Amino acid sequence: GTGQQAGTDSGRMKDGSDFIGGGSYGQGHWRFPPEHRMLGYAYILTHPGVPCLFWPHAVRMPDGRHGDMAAEVATMVQMRKNAGIVADSPVEILIAESDVYVARVRGSNADVTVKLGPRYDFPKEIMPAEGGREWKMCASGKDYAIWSRPHPTRA
């Protein structure tokens, strides 16, 4: 691999916007697969760039649709804010294989590690505890998990 984020040719996500569509725009030719929407949100909300949320996925609709999705998206948005992930935050791809992708993003307040794909076994050394700072699970679901760890406090 190139060590660049998926879907980029320059690795400069600050110059673009990420979007998970619901298919109610245009003719729906490039509809994001509904069964993978949360994987998509786990990616765009943990990685550098400018995430763009599809409104019906971000709020519970009056008829109750998307309630669980909206709650999980809100959790990920809050994690992104708390970690201080912005358009040009550094990202390091730790594993990129056919059944698992693991990356670490350095926000201004915390590091975030995201795992995408069906495989859950990866080397424990990828997420070591350092100086008493443990990784905390922020969100998880079918084929994704997100952890964060605050930066050391400065005296």
PLM regions with names:
Residues T2-A155:
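Carbohydrate-interacting/catalytic domains
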